[in-house]
Amino acid sequence: MPLPQVAIVGRPNVGKSTLFNRLLRQRRAIVEEVPGTTRDRIYGIVEWNDLRFGLFDTGGLLTEEEIERSSERELVEATKAQAELAIAEADLVIFVVDASAGPTAGDWEVADFLRRTDKPILLVANKAESREREFNALQFYELGLGDPIPVSALHGRGIADLLDAIAERLPRREEDGTAEAEAPKIAIVGRPNVGKSALLNAILGQPRQIVSPIPGTTRDAVDTELVWKGQPIVLIDTAGIRRPGRIERGIERYSILRAERAIERSDVAILVVDATEPFTHQDQAVAGKVLDAKKGIVVAINKWDLFEHMEGEGAREAFEEDAREAFHFMPWAPLVFVSALTGKNVEHVVDLALVVVAERSRRIPTAELNQLLREAIAHHPPPTRPGKWVKFYYVTQPEVNPPTFVFFCNRPQLVHFSYKRYLENRIRERYGFLGTPIELVFRERERSAPAWERGKAGRS
């Protein structure tokens, strides 16, 4: 089952990031950055006793009046969107307030907003470094969110009690080893109004056995586990996600953030685009997120029935050329012309996604890879510099998902990007790897020990 998620929210300068870092230092923690659109959303995994949970840090929430007065309106809107996204995905929200300041108008506004989310909330009064501050923390009871938990994130005071409180309120998700853990996860992503919801419904309308709905990590989405032609799969839905906003860019930014989280959990993303509209920067941005996450991708060109009706014969070839130009950075991604309304090619989209899943897990024998490398070098040797040249020794594939190839050579820093692209193209020409990015890594081969030392080591 997915890890339970916890979001830390509150107004600026109450110590949210300090608390985040303090929680991650408990036991063993893995920290990673989850890129946002203007600021990074920071995400980590916390382990406490027998519990593991994901933890989001968010930017400070301003009051509506402060937002109106802000000279960085766009940045403030982005920060607010990040926080709202984290709250929507959370199983539990930690609302951090400042015990040294007492309740403020900003605290009241955040509290009112959190009440409307119907999320479980832990009220945490930070900066309670003394008994007097702990007593002051009691004032926050008037916010109506339960008893405040006094802590000092800076000094670690009260952190164990806070972690125990988190453990009590989070849902327990058993690792039962059922099909969901092994089933390929396919995310349906794209900008608003391209037909993601219609495509999902068309897929679910195909004849198959729906096993069970799985609660997703977002407020608006439900992951669905089903059996597709004998193969268990999980569909991750990001369809129908909208955020009321004053400006279009805010809505656009929010939709990309939602798609981002779905992509992180997926193996393959079906990127839905609208055939009746020109390709946009947002289409490219969502595709870029898939590649950044090193996931597989299938491009589903939806509403094709409408476009074909308007444009007539020859429309497909011209459109495919435009699509290849728009997504020039992933020429290996398959394109599928579909109509969620009529059901045309809907089945083919899922079939292709499963092909991409298989491609991502392919391993190529080392002997075959080295034969390919020798042929590639013979056909086009690596460029040389005066007095310097690149000599390749061998190549191997140590990893899958995505397929990763490590080339050992004498001067990896001299391998030009154009030659890297050449080697990738040769790999794809022979082995395909449809719909998945592949990683090429260039390393200097470790110098072998002298023969007499190797013999001595073998006898010891």
Curated annotation (Swiss-Prot):
Q: Which processes are annotated in GO (biological process)?
A: ribosome biogenesis
Binding, GTP 1: 10-17, 57-61, 126-129
Q: Which family does it belong to?
A: Belongs to the TRAFAC class TrmE-Era-EngA-EngB-Septin-like GTPase superfamily. EngA (Der) GTPase family.
Cite the GO molecular-function annotations of the record: ATP hydrolysis activity; GTP binding; ribosome binding
User: Which SMART domains does this chain map to?
Assistant: AAA (SM00382)
Question: PANTHER family annotated for this entry?
Answer: GTPASE DER (PTHR43834:SF6)
Q: In what residue span(s) does the KH-like domain sit?
A: 362-446
> Which residues are in the EngA-type G domain?
4-174, 184-361
Gene encoding this polypeptide? Answer: der
The positions annotated for binding GTP 2 are 190-197, 237-241, 302-305
The highest taxon in the source lineage is Bacteria
Q: Which PROSITE patterns match?
A: G_ENGA
TM annotation in the entry: none
Supply the name of the protein: GTPase Der
Oligomer status and interactors: Associates with the 50S ribosomal subunit.
Name the lineage.
Bacteria, Pseudomonadati, Thermomicrobiota, Thermomicrobia, Thermomicrobiales
Write out the entry's keywords from A to Z: GTP-binding, Nucleotide-binding, Repeat, Ribosome biogenesis
The task this protein performs is described as:
GTPase that plays an essential role in the late steps of ribosome biogenesis.
Q: Fetch the InterPro entries from UniProt.
A: AAA+_ATPase, G_ENGA, GTP-bd, GTPase_Der, KH_dom-like, KH_dom-like_a/b, P-loop_NTPase, Small_GTP-bd
